[in-house]
Amino acid sequence: MKKKTSLACSECGSRNYTVNVSGTQKETRLEVKKFCRHCNKHTLHRETK
């Protein structure tokens, strides 16, 4: 079953994106480089709960 989580900017902390991830337990969190409209640049976004 898919679980909806959000991606937060590592610099400013704003939650800009939502993604569907698998519900199984995993060791690492998803990290993607995406555009942050608050920082106005591409930053690393990490999976949050």
UniProtKB/Swiss-Prot annotation:
GO terms for cellular component: cytoplasm; ribonucleoprotein complex; ribosome. Pfam families: Ribosomal_L33 (PF00471). The keyword Ribonucleoprotein applies. GO terms for biological process: translation. It comes from the Bacteria. Keywords: Ribonucleoprotein, Ribosomal protein. GO terms for molecular function: structural constituent of ribosome. Belongs to the bacterial ribosomal protein bL33 family. This is Large ribosomal subunit protein bL33B. The gene is rpmG2.
